[in-house]
Amino acid sequence: MRDRIAFQFAASVALLLSLILPLTAHAFGGRPAPAPVAPRSAEAEYNKGLQAKAARNFPDAVNDFRRAVDIRPSFAEAWNELGFALRNTGQYAEALRAYEQALRLRPNYPEALEYMGEAYVKLGRLDEARTILERLQRLDVVRAQDLEGAIRTGR
């Protein structure tokens, strides 16, 4: 019991000193030590991208999702969202490359298939969009209907 109390006291003193010493150094003309900066995580960048996407700020979303896949190249969802953001900035060919990467990582990814099909529609490559549609119909009927509507209307 006494060891536990001593440990808690020592931990409290260490915490207090870690808070006070940088302030006293600054007060006496010294510079406070910079706080350690944790590297950005792929998830943090992905979440920033989702916020930018929700705000319809697709250029920022592109940058955020790119950072996410740079940090973690195996992040299929980030590749898919990167494709979505690229498509919404008119960069259809680059969007297709992002969707291809998402599908390499997760071959039966309905959302990536739908978005890829929509990018093909935007590029006027309707035969390729229909090929994607056939594959998507086996995986997700609702997304397949959305893609079918895009093919029909050319949007």
Stretches found by the model and what they are:
Residues 46, 53, 70, 80, ...:
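Position-specific recognition of the canonical hydrophobic site in helix A of tetratricopeptide repeat
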Residues 42-43, 76-77, 110-111, 144-145:
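Helix-start (N-cap) detector for alpha-helical repeat units in TPR-like alpha-solenoids
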Residues 69-70, 100-104, 137-138:
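Conserved structural position within tetratricopeptide repeats
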Residues 47, 81, 115, 149-150:
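Canonical tetratricopeptide repeat
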Residues 40-71:
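Alpha-helical segment of the N-proximal tetratricopeptide repeat
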